Regions:
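Conserved strand-to-helix beginnings and helix N-cap segments that scaffold or border functional pockets
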Residues: 18, 217-220
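Active-site nucleotide/adenylate-binding loops and adjacent lid/helix of ATP-dependent enzymes
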Residues: 1-26, 32-184
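Acidic-residue sensor for enzyme active/binding pockets
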Residues: 147, 206, 231
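Conserved metal-phosphate-binding beta-hairpin within the catalytic cores
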Residues: 152, 158, 187-217
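Single conserved hydrophobic/aromatic residue that forms the stacking wall/gate
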Residues: 228-237
Length: 237
């Protein structure tokens, strides 16, 4: 195993995630290869790790014939969302103002725009300028005051990190464990994002495979283990 880690033109690591993987590799004596552009990486093997921007990881995996399938909202975990969630298309939502007042995010084309609230016509600019219709997730609005990432490896919670909102609001640990127990189709390495609402409910925000997630301060060796295990186990198209 080698770790291909992106660097800036200055020679510094591309971001905190890249440095975290470098730190973990240093502790475990895993050889690293620095790269500036993903197209210069031509000899990575399926057992190697590629770290960089989301697009870098996507290109590296697609070269190996790996089909990226977002998890988002598994059926087993829908009861933990506490709200209605459904699929639609971007043009369907944007062309019917009576469908607005929802949270919208792409199902697969995640670079098209970031998940956002659509309340008024001024919000349409946040949905990107693409001419192609895409599939989107729609969700009833929830007022999350704080959001936390829960890291899971082989069915066990190995880390919990805050990443948005108030520092003094914590998720209910019983709800977190119940969600892990209920997720029978889970991959080996993944993350659950949970939020605490203005009603002090602990609700699921979304589920993500670990292969391209930000570390959010997780121990570097644990972070390295999570993303390495998740990459080779992606489902193939």
């Amino acid at each position: 195993m080698r770790a291909f880690i992106r660097i800036q033109h200055s020679g510094d690591f591309y971001d905190q995630n890249c440095y975290s993987v470098y730190h973990g590799c240093s502790k475990l004596d895993i050889p690293i290869v620095r790269y500036k552009a993903i197209y210069s990486v031509t000899d990575n093997a399926p057992t190697d790790l590629v770290v960089g921007a989301f697009s870098d990881v996507k290109v590296a995996l697609e070269r190996l014939g790996v089909n990226l399938l977002p998890i988002d909202y598994p059926d087993e975990l829908l009861p933990f969302t506490g709200r209605k969630i459904w699929k639609s298309t971007l043009f369907t939502i944007t062309s019917h103002p009576d469908y607005w007042h929802v949270f919208v995010k792409p199902v697969e084309d995640v670079k098209r725009f970031r998940g956002t609230i659509l309340d008024k016509s001024e919000d349409l600019i946040k949905l990107g300028g693409g001419l192609e219709d895409i599939e989107v997730w729609c969700s009833e609005k929830v007022n999350f005051l704080a959001e936390w990432r829960i890291w899971i490896l082989d069915g066990k919670i190995i880390g919990v990190n805050p990443y948005r909102g108030r520092w003094d609001l914590y998720p209910d640990p019983k709800v977190l464990q119940q969600a892990v127990n209920a997720y029978h189709s889970a991959p080996r390495a993944y993350a659950l994002d949970f939020g605490i609402t203005d009603k002090r409910e602990t609700l699921l925000v979304e589920v993500s495979d670990a292969y391209a997630l930000s570390s959010f301060g997780l121990d570097s060796v644990l972070y390295l283990s999570l993303i390495h295990i998740s990459e080779p186990t992606r489902r193939r198209g």
